[in-house]
Amino acid sequence: MKYRIFKMKYTLLFLSVIALVHIFAVEAKDEPESDALVPQERGCLDIGKTCKDDCECCGCGNVCYCPFDWFGGKWQPFGCSCAYGLKYVCAHKQKKCPNV
């Protein structure tokens, strides 16, 4: 008898957790996606986001870093991403980029 009550309690607890997870999943789907900003709509990209130019990265000292930037050009087989730059980057970006 005790085993049956014990089993029933844990079954109800498990079903309650499943129902709670389902409710949060449904609420997440119902939120409008129009409020979400697309990276192109924002003025700049955060650290770690894929970029093509220094001007796309947020902040005065952040740069578009290409770890495998071979031959000095912007040919990057593995892509570039926004990263923290050095102090002189800020002066360079202010000359180059209108949005800094």
From Swiss-Prot:
UniProt keyword terms in alphabetical order: Disulfide bond, Knottin, Neurotoxin, Secreted, Signal, Toxin
GO MF annotation: an example: toxin activity
UniProt keyword Signal present: yes
Span of the signal peptide: 1-28
Cellular component, GO annotation: extracellular region
Protein localization: Secreted
Proregion span(s): 29-41
Source species, domain of life: Eukaryota
Protein name: U12-ctenitoxin-Pn1a
Species this protein is from: Phoneutria nigriventer
